[in-house]
C-alpha cells in the first residue's frame, strides 16, 4: 500500500512545458503517431534486454517470450501499452522522462517549421516520442521495473502534461514498462479494436517482436463483438530484412525506415541485399529524404543498427560506415560476428572491415543509380540528395581514397556555364564542354556564390569563353586540397600561382606579355617598396580585363578564402603573403606610372580594393577611407 509520503512531486524543466504544449496543440492532425512512438520505445526496450541478456540470462526472470501488449478499456477510457523489455530504474525514469530530451530539446525547438507533418517527424528524431502520448491523453501513468531489480523497486511516474509529474516507489512483480493513457474528451474513437489494429498495421507491422491484443469474438447473446481471453498477434513479427524482397511492399520498407530512423517522411531510396561467401550478412540501408539536425556534428554518434543472427547488438555502430556516409540509416545483420561483440571489438575486426567495404559499395551504387538514371523521378531524387547531403559526401574525397574516383563522379558544382545557384554541373559535364586545347579543370573558391561570380580572377576566362567551377561551400577548400586531378585532368585554382593557359594562349599574346612585363618593371618594383610586408611581390597580370588589380596566392600557399575559414574556426593560419597583380591595360595603372605625389596612396588603395574584392578584411579601414576620400576630393577640385 502506498501513502502520500511515498509520492514525490517534481517539476519538468522549463523547456518541457513548451514541448508538452506543442505535442498537445500543434500535432493533433497527426495524432496516430502516439501509438507508433510508444510501440517503437517498447521495441527498443526489448532489444536492450536481449543484448544485456547475452551476458546475464537471469535478467529474463523466467519470462523469455518478449512481446508488446496493447489493451483498451471503454469504461475507464484508457489505452494501455505493456512491454516485458528491460524496464527502467527510478534514476532512469528521471533521466529519460523527467528530463525531456536532455541536450536535444533546444535544437528541437530551433528546428520547428510550423508544418505539422514535418514537425511530427522531428519528434522521434529528437528522442521525445514518449510525449506524443499527450496528444490524445490528459493523464499518463507509467509503471516500470528494471530487469534484475527486485519487485519492490518498481517506479510509478504520472503526469497530466501541465508542467509537473509525480514519482512513487511501488511493487511491480513483472519487469518492463506499462503505460496507461487516460484519454482526452473526444478521443473515444481510439477505444476500438479495429482502430488500434489499423494503426498498428499501418505504422508498426515491421516490429520484430509480437504486438498482441485480445482476440475479438462474436457474442450471439449480445449480438456484438467482445474481447476473449485468447491473444492474437497483430503484426507480422518477423525481421523485415530477413524476408525475400519480393514479399515486401514499398509501404513496408518505408514504415521500417521510419522506425529505425525515427523519421516521419518516407526515405529517398533504399538498398536491400543478402551477401554470401566469406562473409554472410544482410544489409537494409536507406538514404533519408532530408538531413537530420545534427548532420554536421561529427562528434555526435551516427551509424547503423547492428544485429547478429537477428539479435540486436547496438545502435549507432559508426564503424559500419565511414563518416562521409553518416546520413545513411538502416541495419546490418551478420551471421559471423560473435554475439558478445563490443564497440572495442568492432574497431579491430577484419569481418567488420569487410562489411564496411561492402556497405560503402552498395550505398555509392545506390547514389550512382539515381545520378545516372534517365527517369525524371530519379533525377529529382538525386537533386534532393545533393541538396541535403552533397556537402557531407564531399568529405569522402579526403576520407576514402579507394573510392575517390567514384565519389568525384558524383560531385556537383555551380559554374560559369549557366551561373545558376543550383549545383548541377558534374566534372564529366565540365570535361565534355572543355575547349579542344584545354588541359585543366579551372575553379575558384569563395565564401558565397555572388563573391565567386564577381571575382576579378574570372575576367580573362569569361573573355576566352573558358568555363570555371564556382566552389562556394565551406568544405570545398578541403575538397580541392585532396582532389588534384580527375580522369587525367588536373584541377587548377584561377586565384593561385602564375596564370598558365597553355595552348589556350597563342604565341603573339605570350610575346606581348613578356614585353609589357619589362615595360612595367620599374612600376612594380616601386609599388612593392611602398606596400612592403603586405605583399610577397607586385607583378603584371593577364588574368584581368576590366579590374585594375587582384590578389593571388602562391601555388602552395593557403588561399585567402581558406585563411579566413581557418581564422573563423579559431585555427592557426599559416603565415603567407599574396602577390598583388596589376592590369597593365587599365587606365589607373597606366596613370600610376607617371604619378609622384599620390603614388603611395594609390598603391595602397589598389591593394585594399583587391583585398575587399576577394572577401578579405582591411587592417586599417579608416586609412583606406581617408585615402579614398582624398582621391575623390582631388578629382572634384581638379574638375572645377
UniProtKB/Swiss-Prot annotation:
It comes from the Bacteria. Residues 1-343 are annotated as: A. Keywords: ATP-binding, Chaperone, Cytoplasm, Nucleotide-binding, Stress response. Residues 344-564 are annotated as: B. It is found in: Cytoplasm. PROSITE patterns: HSP90. Belongs to the heat shock protein 90 family. Homodimer. This is Chaperone protein HtpG. It comes from Nitrosomonas europaea (strain ATCC 19718 / CIP 103999 / KCTC 2705 / NBRC 14298). The gene is htpG.
Amino acid at each position: 500500500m502506498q501513502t502520500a509520503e511515498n509520492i514525490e512531486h517534481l517539476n519538468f524543466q522549463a523547456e518541457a512545458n513548451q514541448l508538452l504544449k506543442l505535442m498537445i496543440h500543434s500535432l493533433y492532425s497527426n495524432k496516430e503517431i502516439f501509438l507508433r512512438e510508444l510501440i517503437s520505445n517498447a521495441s527498443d526496450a526489448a532489444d536492450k534486454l536481449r543484448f544485456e541478456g547475452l551476458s546475464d540470462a537471469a535478467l529474463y526472470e523466467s519470462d523469455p517470450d518478449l512481446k508488446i501488449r496493447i489493451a483498451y478499456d471503454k469504461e475507464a477510457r484508457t489505452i494501455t501499452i505493456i512491454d516485458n523489455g528491460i524496464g527502467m530504474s527510478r534514476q532512469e525514469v528521471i533521466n529519460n522522462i523527467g528530463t525531456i530530451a536532455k541536450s536535444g530539446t533546444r535544437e528541437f525547438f530551433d528546428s520547428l517549421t510550423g508544418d505539422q507533418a514535418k514537425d511530427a517527424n522531428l519528434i522521434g528524431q529528437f528522442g521525445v516520442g514518449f510525449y506524443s502520448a499527450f496528444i490524445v491523453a490528459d493523464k499518463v501513468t507509467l509503471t516500470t521495473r528494471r530487469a534484475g531489480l527486485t519487485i519492490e523497486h518498481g517506479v510509478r511516474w504520472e503526469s497530466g502534461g501541465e508542467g509537473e509529474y509525480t514519482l512513487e516507489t511501488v511493487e511491480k512483480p513483472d519487469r518492463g514498462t506499462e503505460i496507461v493513457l487516460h484519454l482526452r474528451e473526444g478521443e473515444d474513437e481510439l477505444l476500438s479494436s479495429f482502430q488500434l489494429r489499423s494503426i498498428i498495421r499501418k505504422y508498426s507491422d515491421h516490429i520484430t517482436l509480437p504486438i498482441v491484443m485480445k482476440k475479438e469474438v462474436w457474442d450471439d447473446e449480445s449480438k456484438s463483438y467482445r474481447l476473449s481471453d485468447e491473444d492474437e498477434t497483430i503484426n507480422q513479427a518477423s525481421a523485415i530484412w530477413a524476408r525475400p524482397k519480393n514479399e515486401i511492399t514499398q509501404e513496408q520498407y518505408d514504415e521500417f525506415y521510419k522506425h529505425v530512423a525515427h523519421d516521419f517522411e518516407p526515405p529517398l531510396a533504399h538498398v536491400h541485399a543478402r551477401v554470401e561467401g566469406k562473409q554472410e550478412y544482410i544489409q537494409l540501408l536507406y538514404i533519408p529524404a532530408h538531413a537530420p539536425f545534427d548532420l554536421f556534428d561529427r562528434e555526435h554518434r551516427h551509424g547503423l543498427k547492428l544485429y547478429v543472427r537477428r539479435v540486436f547488438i547496438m545502435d549507432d555502430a559508426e564503424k559500419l560506415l565511414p563518416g562521409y556516409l553518416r546520413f545513411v540509416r538502416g541495419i546490418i545483420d551478420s551471421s559471423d560476428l560473435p554475439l558478445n561483440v563490443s564497440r572495442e571489438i568492432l574497431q579491430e575486426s577484419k569481418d567488420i572491415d569487410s562489411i564496411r567495404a561492402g556497405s560503402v559499395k552498395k550505398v555509392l551504387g545506390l547514389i550512382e543509380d539515381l545520378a545516372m538514371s534517365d527517369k525524371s523521378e530519379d533525377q529529382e531524387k538525386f537533386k534532393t540528395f545533393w541538396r541535403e547531403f552533397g556537402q557531407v559526401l564531399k568529405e569522402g574525397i579526403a576520407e576514402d581514397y579507394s573510392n575517390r574516383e567514384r565519389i568525384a563522379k558524383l560531385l556537383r558544382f555551380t559554374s560559369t556555364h549557366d551561373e545558376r545557384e543550383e549545383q548541377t554541373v558534374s566534372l564529366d559535364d565540365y570535361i565534355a564542354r572543355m575547349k579542344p586545347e584545354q588541359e585543366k579543370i579551372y575553379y575558384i573558391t569563395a565564401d558565397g556564390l555572388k563573391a565567386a561570380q564577381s571575382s576579378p580572377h574570372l575576367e580573362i576566362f569569361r573573355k576566352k569563353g573558358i568555363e570555371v567551377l564556382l566552389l562556394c561551400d565551406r568544405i570545398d577548400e578541403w575538397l580541392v586540397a585532396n582532389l588534384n586531378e580527375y580522369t587525367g585532368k588536373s584541377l587548377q585554382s584561377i586565384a593561385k600561382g602564375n596564370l598558365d593557359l597553355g595552348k589556350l594562349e597563342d604565341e603573339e599574346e605570350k610575346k606581348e606579355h613578356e614585353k609589357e612585363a619589362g615595360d612595367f618593371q620599374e612600376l612594380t618594383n616601386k609599388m612593392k617598396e611602398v606596400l612592403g610586408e603586405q605583399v610577397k611581390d607586385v607583378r603584371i597580370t593577364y588574368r584581368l580585363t576590366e579590374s585594375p588589380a587582384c590578389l593571388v596566392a602562391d601555388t602552395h600557399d593557403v588561399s585567402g578564402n581558406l585563411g579566413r575559414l581557418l581564422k573563423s574556426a579559431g585555427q592557426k593560419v599559416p603565415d603567407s603573403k599574396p602577390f598583388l597583380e596589376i592590369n597593365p591595360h587599365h587606365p589607373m595603372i597606366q596613370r600610376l606610372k607617371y604619378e609622384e605625389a599620390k603614388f603611395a596612396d594609390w598603391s595602397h588603395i589598389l591593394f585594399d580594393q583587391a583585398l575587399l574584392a576577394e572577401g578579405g578584411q582591411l587592417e586599417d579601414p579608416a586609412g583606406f577611407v581617408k585615402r579614398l576620400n582624398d582621391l575623390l576630393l582631388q578629382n572634384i577640385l581638379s574638375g572645377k
